[in-house]
């Protein structure tokens, strides 16, 4: 697409499914261009150093020459110049950013050809929707630079109220994790950066991440407006101070979840074209069991951690088959808590060769979990409304002083007429959806086992916050992974009491948006049937592993008498707290009456 000399588009976003071989096809394309000896000059940006080196070697192997592609991610001023000897340069996305913000090196990013028009820039896995950089308290404590102890980098958005900033500081002190987007440079940032670089106690990975973060901060703190697309744990700046994009040659971005990403909608329409690719994968052999629960965010296991993690481990045991590799994805601090339990032999994790760990922010594009047929997530990424507000405003550019001072008079409507609150909400829900899709596609589901694109039989157990935001994200996941087997399980709770279980059910029904009828149906079909359905699902899963294409093996259905029995049990539980339940039932268009002394639920229409 972008190799035509007179192409009018400066930027194309190619949206294809995770695991469909985008990088492989990119390698073949560039290798064949080298083999055919075209006059193109190519620049490729990819997230990781080792991947850049591997990509360059693979391109040369297909091109049949060792002098077509070269991986360069150093910091020398001429490191990014496209020379005649190596028509194709492969660099890291972070190196691309550094050169983009360096006046002396910016010109070297232009992949000019012989006629200064036939250049191509390809950015692999860059337009991921919005995350934040996180620093753990343990990492920060190893940096002895005499800096303030409360927080290293301060929030700088006037949109944050004083209480929001205080909450962020308290969050950092209590959990060791703080969200740093957007923000201003701390007065001691340069000293901190030097301390990090010189420290022998800080590992190289953290040094690399922190350096990239500081570079991002400097761009935010500049006097000019910089537009960012933030990837999982990394920042990618494609637009600088000018109103026009910096990319003056055709560029292509490959992204698996662009449809869920609000950022592409905020980019200049005259210079950006979104190119969706038809889905090619069939998820009919995958089962996603959603554990609906209150408080499944990153702090969900913060109190009474031992008991909570033990409960999660016991609960998911029935979905883990001993002869099947299992991946566990969580926050890094949750993993540390699991390891503490392991030391006391409460649970066994690290010594189990069939268990693989991964943590949020380090999963994008990885293939090391592709042999795992089970996936369990402990806790779930969560971002506050203040974070989404900050992100939206950061994408629009740095605000004026008048905007900062006049909070009551701000116009929260974008150029397309959409209300500001709707965009902020969509950004948050898209983050949920994007994260779970990326996680699921790390495991064996990314393989094809038939000509129809069927994936292997996999089982995913996922905790999900019981609120409307998570529900919207879940619908986005269902839309993207159309025929995945989705099972709601409201039976999981950190607490074991019946009172907390009922409270959770009412919370789910109160804050879950329409269609309420579907929620009620899933509630009936999954929570009150208990262990019998779990056993049936597990038996079906085992049978399908033996013959994944057996048409006669269908998920267990509930017969009409069983439905009536479940309705009666649900009515009995809700009737214990009719004051709270009245509003819920009205919203669901359900009456609760007593018949022969027993509570009964009546659907109005």
Spans of features found by a protein language model:
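ASCE RecA-like P-loop NTPase motor cores
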Residues: 1-605
């Amino acid at each position: 697409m972008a190799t035509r000399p007179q192409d009018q588009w400066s930027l194309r976003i190619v949206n294809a499914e995770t695991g469909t071989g985008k990088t492989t096809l990119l390698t073949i394309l560039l290798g064949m261009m080298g083999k055919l000896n075209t006059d193109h000059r190519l620049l490729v940006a990819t997230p990781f150093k080792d991947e850049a080196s591997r990509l360059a070697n693979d391109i040369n192997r297909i091109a049949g020459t060792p002098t077509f592609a070269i991986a360069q991610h150093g910091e020398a001023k001429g490191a990014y110049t496209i020379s005649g000897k190596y028509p194709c340069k492969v660099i890291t996305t972070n190196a691309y950013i550094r050169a983009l913000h360096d006046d002396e090196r910016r010109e070297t990013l232009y992949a000019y050809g012989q006629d200064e028009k036939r250049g191509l820039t390809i950015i692999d896995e860059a337009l991921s929707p919005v995350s934040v950089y996180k620093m753990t308290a343990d990492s920060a404590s190893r940096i002895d630079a005499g800096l303030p102890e409360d927080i290293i980098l301060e929030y700088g958005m006037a949109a944050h109220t004083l209480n929001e900033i205080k909450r962020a500081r308290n969050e950092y002190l209590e959990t060791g994790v703080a969200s740093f987007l957007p923000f201003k440079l701390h007065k001691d940032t340069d000293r901190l950066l030097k301390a990090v670089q010189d420290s022998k106690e800080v590992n190289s990975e953290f040094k690399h991440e922190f350096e990239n973060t500081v570079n991002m901060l400097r761009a935010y703190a500049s006097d000019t407006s910089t537009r960012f697309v933030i990837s999982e744990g990394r920042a990618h700046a494609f637009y600088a101070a000018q109103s026009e994009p910096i990319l003056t040659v055709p560029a292509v971005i490959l992204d698996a979840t662009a449809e869920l990403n609000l950022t592409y909608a905020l980019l200049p329409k005259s210079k950006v074209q979104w190119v969706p690719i038809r889905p090619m994968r069939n998820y009919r052999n995958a089962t996603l069991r959603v554990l609906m629960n209150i408080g499944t965010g990153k702090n969900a296991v913060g109190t009474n951690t031992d008991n909570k993690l033990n409960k999660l481990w016991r609960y998911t045991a029935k979905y883990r088959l001993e002869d099947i590799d299992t991946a566990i994805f969580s926050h890094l601090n949750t993993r540390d808590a699991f390891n503490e339990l392991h030391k006391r032999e409460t649970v066994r994790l690290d010594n189990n060769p069939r268990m693989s760990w991964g943590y949020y922010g380090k999963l994008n594009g990885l293939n090391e979990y592709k042999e795992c047929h089970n996936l369990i997530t402990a806790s779930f990424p969560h971002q506050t409304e203040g974070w989404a507000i900050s992100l939206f405003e950061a994408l629009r550019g740095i605000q004026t002083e008048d905007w900062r001072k006049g909070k009551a008079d701000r116009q929260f409507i974008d150029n397309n007429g959409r209300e500001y609150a709707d965009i902020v909400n969509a950004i948050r829900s898209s983050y949920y959806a994007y994260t779970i899709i990326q996680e699921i596609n790390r495991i064996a589901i990314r393989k094809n086992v038939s000509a129809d694109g069927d994936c292997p039989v996999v089982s995913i157990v996922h905790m999900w916050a019981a609120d409307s935001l998570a529900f919207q994200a879940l619908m986005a996941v269902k839309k993207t992974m159309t025929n995945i087997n989705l099972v709601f399980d409201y039976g999981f709770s950190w607490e074991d009491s019946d009172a907390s279980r009922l409270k959770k059910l009412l919370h789910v029904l109160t804050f879950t948006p329409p269609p309420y009828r579907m929620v009620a149906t899933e509630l009936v079909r999954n929570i009150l049937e208990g262990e019998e359905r779990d056993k049936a699902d597990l038996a079906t899963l085992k049978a399908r592993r033996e013959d994944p294409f057996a048409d006669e093996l269908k998920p267990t259905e509930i017969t009409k008498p069983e439905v009536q029995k479940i309705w009666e049990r649900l009515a009995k539980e809700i009737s214990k707290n009719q004051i709270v339940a009245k509003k819920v039932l009205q919203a669901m268009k359900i009456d609760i009456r007593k018949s022969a002394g027993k509570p009964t639920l009546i659907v109005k229409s």
